[in-house]
Amino acid sequence: MAATMNKTPATTFLLIPAAASLVLLLAAAASVEASAFDYAGAFDKCLLFFEAQRSGKLPDDRLVRWRGDSALTDGFSQGVDLVGGYYDSGDHVKFGLPMAYAVTMLSWGVVEFEKEMVDGNKLHRVLDAIRWGTNYFVKAHTQHNALWVQVGDGDSDHLCWERAEDMSTPRTAFKIDINNPGSEVAGETAAALAAAAKAFKPYDRMYSDLLLLHSKQLFTFADTFRGKYDDSLQSAKKFYPSASGYQDELLWAAAWLYEATGDEQYLRYVSQNAEAFGGTGWAVTEFSWDNKYAGLQVLLSKVLFEQGGSAAGYADTLKQYQAKAEFFLCACLQKNNGHNVKMTPGGLMYVSDWSNMQYVSSSAFLLTVYADYLAESRGTLRCPDGEVKPAEILLFARSQVDYVLGKNPKGMSYMVGYGSYYPTHVHHRGASIPSIYAMNATVGCMEGFDKYYNSKNADPNVLHGALVGGPDANDAYDDDRCNYQHAEPTLAGNAPMSGVFARLAASPADNTPEYTPAPNAPSPSNGGSPLEFVHTVTNTWKANGVDYYRHVVTAKNTCGHAITYLKLQIKELSGEIYGVSRTNAKDMYEFPSWMTRLDAGAQLTIVYIQGGPAAKIAVVEYKTA
């Protein structure tokens, strides 16, 4: 479940798990170093998660075989067919707002990376995932000014731990209408249907037109009868409260309708309401199911990139949207004059103590698409702390994905089923209870808590592709299904990863040319170095007959000036390293992505684990303020 977003400070120093965890860290780090991440495989698993979350009558050709049909009478008692759609997370409520956001993000991935998905033979599966959501939205939109936006109640649902196939909790449905408006969820559903319409247009024109019809009607409903959805729907407020209000969703829906139709009335809407609705005023450091401003600003920047001078009459406003988009991007890249997204010591963006990975995935998506926009226009991102090339933006986005897949201080994949070391006690009812095909007897409401929720056994069903909430602000993770803030996956967290995986899977392999120092650069030696290195071994152990060491290197700035650029040569390194960022040149490293300067007297901490002798570290090049 989602909650309000709390900010948590981070530090630039690396923290390593206790000695008891070091062998696991070593094994995982070695596998990370030995081979590149399989983004295509991760993409495949990401789509499996959406299959596992399906509600309703499941198709015979489904790939997730441990799931069965469920909730086959949703809405019937209230005279409407609401069978289908997706369960939100580890429970069985169908929350309309995050579900619609997830479909929007899946569709945006297709819009941007259709070719990559076709080349990787994944497009049909992504479109199937989108259609499972849009079919439900079309059914839920029963009148022009009415939309069913929730099935199930979070409070009663959470009192039971049972499989979807055994559900005994009330399946009450809730709707918004002219007397009980909900502009956020109506606007987001309009955005989802418009984005999906564009994704389907080349392949199913009639279906695309149907989605557009519903999208336009829902946008008009959201805009004409304005009101916060969680004022009308108290049962959603506890779980998905609207902190940002509904104005971002109105702009977001209009932007997607313009993207899908090219109809100028929607571009006029986002231009005329830009200031009043906060589109050109909000400078944010998060993008989520609640706050759409960063996504809106990036999407409208695309219009400027594509149309340039032909967007006459709107160009000035679009440039204001773009300025706010670039504020967000520079904040992610740690180049925003101190107004940056917080980072964990291991290099993960950290926005919230609750389900932080959803912000990582959405930010990685925006960084990835914007990098491509810039590359196609031969532009660069100009941040307060320096210019950033498209390839560097993509590299940072990839660093976040790599962290997710295992390049992190715990050496753990936070995507279930990816790699050999991943969460096995996920906060998810279906994953934690044996499948109905393995154990046909009904699991009762409280029986599920006694036998499975509190069990120390690993999940009997692997929830392939689920992106859990992730580690805390210090890169620590407790693999415990009671730890719902960190161990629960969500639709909103997974959806943006689809497009990012498609893009990264299609990228060419990295080249690692030999580094050639600049003509006046210092030679690779410690003579005259601006840094004083202190190298210590803080732990040692034996694994598989090999002695391993945990090395900690502190590099103190002794030159008397702030260092704004640093290039290190690290030779004879065989293990994973933390605290510096690898460059494309062999054996060359620079400041970590979350660090832009090292003040006089300050220390940079580098940690690595390997067998045999210590690595050799030397300063190759540096600049001072």
From Swiss-Prot:
Q: Report the enzyme's class at the first EC level.
A: hydrolase
Q: Which residues form the active site?
A: 91 (nucleophile), 427, 479, 488
Single Gene Ontology BP annotation: cellulose catabolic process
Entry-linked Gene3D superfamilies: 1.50.10.10
One Pfam match, given by its short name, reads CBM49
Tell me the keywords, alphabetical order.
Carbohydrate metabolism, Cellulose degradation, Glycoprotein, Glycosidase, Hydrolase, Polysaccharide degradation, Secreted, Signal
Per the UniProt annotation, where are the glycans attached?
440
Entry's EC annotation: 3.2.1.4
**A Gene Ontology term for the protein's cellular component:** extracellular region
**A single Gene Ontology molecular function, please?**
carbohydrate binding
What superkingdom does the record give? Eukaryota
Q: Which residues form the signal peptide?
A: 1-34
Task: State where the protein is found.
Answer: Secreted
Catalysed reaction per UniProt?
A: Endohydrolysis of (1->4)-beta-D-glucosidic linkages in cellulose, lichenin and cereal beta-D-glucans
Tell me the segments the record calls region Disordered: 509-530
Concerning its family, UniProt says: Belongs to the glycosyl hydrolase 9 (cellulase E) family.
Entry protein name: Endoglucanase 13
Look up and give the organism this protein is from.
Oryza sativa subsp. indica (Rice)
